[in-house]
Amino acid sequence: MLAELGFIRTIGENDEVPVEPESDSGDEEEEGPIVLGRKQKALQKNRSADFNPDFVFTEKEGMYDGSWALADVMSQLKKKRAATTLDEKIEKVRKRRKAEDKEAKSGKVEEKEGQADSDLKGQENPGEDEAGSKDEDSETDYSSEDEEILTKADTLKVKEKKKKKKGQAAGGFFEDASEYDKSLSFQDMNLSRPLLKAITAMGFKQPTPIQKACIPVGLLGKDICACAATGTGKTAAFALPVLERLIYKPRQAAVTRVLVLVPTRELGIQVHSVTKQLAQFCSITTCLAVGGLDVKSQEAALRAAPDILIATPGRLIDHLHNCPSFHLSSIEVLILDEADRMLDEYFEEQMKEIIRMCSHHRQTMLFSATMTDEVKDLASVSLKNPVRIFVNSNTDVAPFLRQEFIRIRPNREGDREAIVAALLMRTFTDHVMLFTQTKKQAHRMHILLGLLGLQVGELHGNLSQTQRLEALRRFKDEQIDILVATDVAARGLDIEGVKTVINFTMPNTVKHYVHRVGRTARAGRAGRSVSLVGEEERKMLKEIVKAAKAPVKARILPQDVILKFRDKIEKLEKDVYAVLQLEAEEKEMQQSEAQIDTAQRLLAKGKETADQEPERSWFQTKEERKKEKIAKALQEFDLALRGKKKRKKFMKDAKKKGEMTAEERSQFEILKAQMFAERLAKRNRRTKRARAMPEDEPTGPAKKQKQQQKSVFDEELTNTSKKALKQYRAGPSFEERKQSGLPRQRRGNFKSKSRYKRKK
């Protein structure tokens, strides 16, 4: 009856309901069939036939507004001459290659059918070439045999932990070191109404563990030394108590009261964005002073004395020495975010200089994901009676992260590029971050993946600030699917929606690995990391498997798939070289144009007026900066690596050849990581200095000492045991006499009789 009227009927007691079988997570499982890129596009087209393609939701999904406060930052960027982008160059080379391939194919046809017939066909159908080129652009050239190979599924195996031997105790590094009220909510923290309104507007429901522990202590005005895993909301943990303090105690004069130091420009922009959103309903002003942005506009903003200044150490020192009205004597709160990273880089001397110039009567908050010896030294110098907050272990990965590893066989290091290309074209097609060890390899991977037809961006130190922000914006807005980055993007950046992190090589240390994979599975979301592990990196893999709480998977790609992609990359080597040549030509053109511009400017102004412009001063001389850079650089001339004949020979051979092979490139990436690990091991072997803060490493179990029973008057009188009588007859012991101040017992003048003497 209900079915006839078009209603959905209810399920009866005797009706059987088909239940979908749950996915079995056994020791070995095979993923579903691979769907290639062009088939996915065709499926998407068929699905969207019923819907209007121009329809857009008015509200974006996410925790808070997607604008990311980039508009005002982009306006401060240094305006440079517009040049062709790398993607345009890649597209140009791709079109040229397709045209050459088409000519080669048409040449074969001409040999068979005759030149005259082909000419006639060309005259009759002049529009065929354009249509064909469009079809080729939309589809990748895969034959039926190739599709059979490329659609083979990968195999996943569970990597078992090795059982611990008896006597090996697990180290409890920072675990359960801090206690906090787990039922605490934002409403219970006594925050002002404007802040609670901003928290609600940003979509925060419950505070994270680090926020529950830090915000109440920060509101008391105490110094904080906090250590928590990456992606746990440290920015809001220090921003909320600072904003509450500024609202509660308004400023009397126009001075900057809060300084936030960050290691990278991108992290600075992110902290500035979050702070601005938290302060949107109050009159607190913020300013961003990082490298790459216009110096003059920053100086103008600093003269207005903003309440909160977010800066990188280098640009801050530049302003302190060259902006007369700007100083740090009025700073009430100093925040050091990602302190371990700042001391890893070349910021050590700069950090000391900034702390020296800050006000002594200040509250200091030090936040770090890892607690290294350098961070402890910095804490002992900058903090006064700090409250130590360690929420969880710094070697913990996110709880919902699925870790996968791909083994690289011995003498097959050159397969890394082919494996990454296979993963990105077959399995992980969007919202992917690919980490490399060097800037050169990141740039090469961008070109290579671009030539394979993928939407790629890159993020590393060789790019200008405009290019960095543009890459981040495009990745966030889903204009590009893959972001190739070095460790510059491995810390603190909260890029929403990252599904997969791929490691081209294993990073320097386990801590760096934790930071890299921390870009995904953030704030309770699920994510996946895939790392390529060679024979030289097996030791680190064992450490990661040992520390993992969830089972770790081993992914196995079919060998014929790897060979197919390896052949494909070998064919693209000429195109990669062509793109690099175009870049080199453009760079030379820009340099010559810049020289002409400077010459014209000098002629227009006159040499005298040009010389009158004051040079920007710095707290170190050029020679001191050069020495510091060489001392910390990981190059063949590094003092720590002298005598390593193998490595020096490898570097020399690579320089002689000029262009390295795929295996040599992979070897160079691993070599860089090993160099860093070696330096770290040397640093750890140094004798440790005495610190103001107590050590956090757990000491060994103390031996239990037997407690001596105190002398009791009535017990001594009533105790008639053999031992008690013996002690009573012997009288007080030497210690008892000493404590009570009795004179020592004098020995008598007893002499043994001659009969007891030994006979000679």
Curated annotation (Swiss-Prot):
Q: Where is this motif: DEAD box?
A: 337-340
**Entry EC no(s):** 3.6.4.13
- InterPro entries in the cross-refs: DEAD/DEAH_box_helicase_dom, DEAD_box_RNA_helicase, Helicase_ATP-bd, Helicase_C-like, P-loop_NTPase, RNA-helicase_DEAD-box_CS, RNA_helicase_DEAD_Q_motif
Q: Name one Pfam family in it.
A: Helicase_C
Sorted alphabetically, which PANTHER family does this protein's record hold? ATP-DEPENDENT RNA HELICASE RHLE-RELATED (PTHR47959), RNA HELICASE (PTHR47959:SF22)
Q: What does this protein do?
A: Probable ATP-dependent RNA helicase. Component of the nucleolar ribosomal RNA (rRNA) processing machinery that regulates 3' end formation of ribosomal 47S rRNA.
Assembly with partners or alone: Associates with PeBoW complex, composed of BOP1, PES1 and WDR12. Interacts directly with BOP1 and PES1.
Q: What is this protein called?
A: Probable ATP-dependent RNA helicase DDX27
Organism whose genome encodes this protein: Mus musculus (Mouse)
Its organism's taxonomic lineage begins at: Eukaryota, Metazoa, Chordata, Craniata, Vertebrata
